[in-house]
Amino acid sequence: MIVFKKQSILSQLSEDGNLMSKAIKLQSKAAEYGFDWPAVELVFDKLQEEISELKQEVVLSNLESSVDRDYYQERLQDELGDVLFCCMNLARFLKVDPSKALNSTNDKFERRFNFIESFVAQQGKKIEDLSLTELDKAWDQAKEQGL
């Protein structure tokens, strides 16, 4: 039988409302007590494992059309949470601020999508008139231009 301590080591962490920060704080605190991966390669392995588990839940949720959707939504949420938590651990290992990384990627996505919109408008079309393949080609052009 497992007996829980009244006061967890993790309960000492302050709440700042930032979920990415909380994940990193939880992992950092656990690491102080030896609960950590010894190398970043193992974090990548764990991330691949978590992605595989998420993929498995996606397949199961699509196969079981007649059963409780709430159950599968909860499973998908749980597995996606594991992937995100692992990504925060990777950010900690790489010493990268995940908020800054995500903000940078959001900005990059906006620049590239704006390029696609301009590209499509120059052809006198609407974005929904192009296939995904055509949109991907425009995306690749945006990348080539350093956007």
Question: Which residues does each predicted region cover?
Answer:
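Flexible "arm" and connector segments at domain edges
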Residues: M1-L80, F85-L147
